[in-house]
């Protein structure tokens, strides 16, 4: 497959934040941001040796994307960071048919907040981050650390919760291939867009494939909903920062609700069963004392009111903003 079938990703200088917001962030268009992290202390300090010597004893979660694609973060196998980096350095220059572990997203900042001093969490190209406004019980980690090597990669996927994702290279180089959400019909989760046959089939279905290289000190902006497949060109260290702005948060909220509502529905169904049994029992027995002194009826009325208010706010938003803007 010749390069003419692949669309080269655009790039922009990190200092031109206004142009980035206008042309890329607001239009949800991917771009390589040149020099985003070039002045970060991490670029000067972080290395394989730094992490082996400073955090080598820490057990970190590793993933196996081919065999355990949907594995939750808390269920991932943990190995000492020094052991992982030694394995990465050993396997960086050889081909291997055996699936190797990948440190594809270590949520490091809670355990080692000092590492945040080496990066910039308040990216100048982005407005206020709504992830910081979420309650702790449903927080979405705003940053994670990725250490990779030549024989491991993340397969084709989209990021959850409609986040803006910014992948900043600290050490090494990565290549990325992307497909727009408008061409979702041509791809599926877990594919390898760097496989010539798969890429050929995607292009044959009428989809566009975008490709770019992210070098040390540069960042890769991945808009919400975009399919992306990232490979390591050698040993790499990168930071992924997640961001949700005002425009995207209603979509994030919708996905979060999608996780919470099934749990709430199960609880409500159990409550409904209990009420049915209670109604039957009331024919022979009076209501339990706890129902009388625990404000049961008042709480139920308040719950119904909250549900109605929430539904009305959603209806008002659809009619006054979304539907009007869709028809214009």
Where are these regions (language model features)?
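N-terminal accessory scaffold of Fe(II)-dependent oxygenases
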Residues: 1-219, 227-328
């Amino acid at each position: 497959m010749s390069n003419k079938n692949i669309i080269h990703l655009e790039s922009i200088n990190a200092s031109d934040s206004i142009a980035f917001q206008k042309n890329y962030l607001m239009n949800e268009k991917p771009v390589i941001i040149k020099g985003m992290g070039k002045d970060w202390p991490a670029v000067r300090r972080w290395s394989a040796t730094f992490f082996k010597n400073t955090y080598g004893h820490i057990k970190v979660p590793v993933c196996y994307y081919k065999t355990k694609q949907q594995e939750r973060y808390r269920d991932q196998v943990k190995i000492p960071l020094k052991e992982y980096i030694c394995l990465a350095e050993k396997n960086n220059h050889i081909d291997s048919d055996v699936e190797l572990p990948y440190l594809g997203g270590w949520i490091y900042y809670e355990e080692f907040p000092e590492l945040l001093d080496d990066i910039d969490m308040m990216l100048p190209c982005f407005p206020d981050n709504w992830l910081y406004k979420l309650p702790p019980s449903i927080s979405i980690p705003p940053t994670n650390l990725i250490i990779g090597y030549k024989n491991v990669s993340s397969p084709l996927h989209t990021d959850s919760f409609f986040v803006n994702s910014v992948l900043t290279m600290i050490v090494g180089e990565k290549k990325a291939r992307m497909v727009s959400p408008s061409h979702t019909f041509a791809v599926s989760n877990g594919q390898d867009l760097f496989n010539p046959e798969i890429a050929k089939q995607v292009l044959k279905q009428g989809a566009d494939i975008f490709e770019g290289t992210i070098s040390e000190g540069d960042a890769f902006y991945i808009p919400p909903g975009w399919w992306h497949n990232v490979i390591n060109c050698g040993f790499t260290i990168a930071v992924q920062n997640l961001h949700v702005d005002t425009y995207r948060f209603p979509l994030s909220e919708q996905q979060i609700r999608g996780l919470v509502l099934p749990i709430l529905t199960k609880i409500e169904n159990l409550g409904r069963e209990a009420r049915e049994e209670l109604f039957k029992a009331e024919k022979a027995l009076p209501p339990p004392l706890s129902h009388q002194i625990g404000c049961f009826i008042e709480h139920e009325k308040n719950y119904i009111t909250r549900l109605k208010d929430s539904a009305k706010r959603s209806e008002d938003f659809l009619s006054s903003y979304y539907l009007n803007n869709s028809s214009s």
